[in-house]
UniProtKB/Swiss-Prot annotation:
InterPro entries: eIF2B_alpha/beta/delta (IPR051501), elF-2B_alpha_N (IPR042528), IF-2B-related (IPR000649), IF_2B-like_C (IPR042529), NagB/RpiA_transferase-like (IPR037171). It is found in: Cytoplasm, Cytosol. One of its GO terms (cellular component) is cytosol. This is Translation initiation factor eIF2B subunit alpha. One of its GO terms (molecular function) is translation initiation factor activity. The keyword Cytoplasm applies. It comes from the Eukaryota. Acts as a component of the translation initiation factor 2B (eIF2B) complex, which catalyzes the exchange of GDP for GTP on eukaryotic initiation factor 2 (eIF2) gamma subunit. Its guanine nucleotide exchange factor activity is repressed when bound to eIF2 complex phosphorylated on the alpha subunit, thereby limiting the amount of methionyl-initiator methionine tRNA available to the ribosome and consequently global translation is repressed. Keywords: Cytoplasm, Initiation factor, Protein biosynthesis. GO terms for biological process: cytoplasmic translational initiation; translational initiation. Belongs to the eIF-2B alpha/beta/delta subunits family.
């Protein structure tokens, strides 16, 4: 054991990173669930308690891996443990039967997660009408899938995408939409208030949906929601239910307690700027996430249904009880 981690599960991180590199378009939930199913299959434990301990050790390894730059991975792991091991000893007193059933439950969760984006796209389809203009921030595979689904259905709409600094992920979104022949325009992050009167609504993804119905997402999401509310524009969120998390941030500083979300090399252009005499002496704050309170969110599109922020706590109760 080193730093609280069980070295017997080093293979978990190696396999996870391999799957992430190979399957770039899948939800983070899929490789995570597959690996945890493998942990159950490979387990030599002869008791439920021992097997649960192995799963917990594997989860610790996953949560500590270098890839874990978001809180989504933690949410998936917690969802797996909750769903798969719920009331295990009571339901299956025979351990071999119990182990087989845990694998079966894991496969059910994997299949459910695989279909979640399709379900979200279908549920949100009626909100994309011909002629609408949608403002998108950052890169979200759920949001992208939703828009591509609507275009495939023959909907005619246009999209405005923010650059989404500091990683400029908006360029990736814009390129994918352009490749699908969806009219798209890229704008600076600071230009949202300039164009907000031209959009019909805002659509964003989420790294996490918290207990009060608010979201944690790409930095800049909160200020876009403020502008949207000031101009009376609907603010929609599209995300899978595995991103529901039992956390309750009260302000922006609480985000750092959820995840260390600062990037190590922010604003390289600034550091090399010729007008800065000593760029290395600049103090730069570079968070990647912010918290948007539920009062700024109109609806959330999930595979569980189209929810109001106030309905999120009810869904969490169903998931955790």
């Amino acid at each position: 054991m080193t730093g609280g981690l069980n070295k017997d599960f080093d293979w978990v991180v190696a396999k996870f990173e391999e799957m992430i590199k190979r399957e770039t378009e899948v939800s983070i939930a899929i490789p995570t669930i597959r690996i945890l199913i493998d942990v159950i299959r490979k387990s030599n434990s002869t008791t439920v308690v021992g097997l649960q301990k192995e799963l917990e050790d594997a989860v610790k390894q996953l949560k500590s891996c270098p890839y874990n730059q978001s809180i989504s991975l933690s949410s998936v792991c917690d969802s797996f443990i909750r769903f798969v091991t719920k009331r295990t000893e009571l339901d299956f007193p025979n351990f071999d039967t119990c182990k087989s059933n845990l694998v079966e439950r894991g496969e059910q969760l994997s299949n459910k997660s695989s279909m979640s984006r399709t379900k979200i796209s279908q549920l949100a389809d009626k909100f994309i009408r011909d002629g609408v203009t949608i403002l998108v921030h950052g890169f979200s595979r759920v949001v992208l899938g939703l828009l591509l689904h609507a275009a495939f259905q023959g909907k005619r709409f246009s999209v405005i995408v923010t650059e989404s600094r500091p990683d400029s992920s908006g360029y990736k979104t814009a390129a994918r939409l352009q490749a699908a022949n969806i009219p798209v325009k890229l704008i600076m992050d600071g230009g949202v208030s300039r164009i907000i009167d031209k959009v019909d609504y805002v659509l964003v993804g989420a790294e996490a949906i918290v207990e009060n119905g608010g979201i944690v997402n790409k930095i800049g999401t909160y200020q876009i929601s403020i502008v949207a509310k000031a101009f009376k524009k609907p603010f929609y969120v599209a995300a899978e239910s595995f991103k529901f998390t039992r956390s309750y941030p009260l302000n922006q500083s609480d985000i750092e307690n959820l995840k260390n979300d600062h990037i190590s090399e922010p604003f390289k252009a600034c550091r090399s700027c010729s007008s800065c005499e000593n760029p290395e002496q600049l103090t730069i704050d570079s968070p990647t996430l912010d918290y948007t309170p539920p009062s700024y969110i109109t609806l959330l599109f999930t595979e569980l249904g189209v929810l109001t922020p106030s309905a999120v706590s009810d869904e969490l109760i169903k998931l955790y009880c």
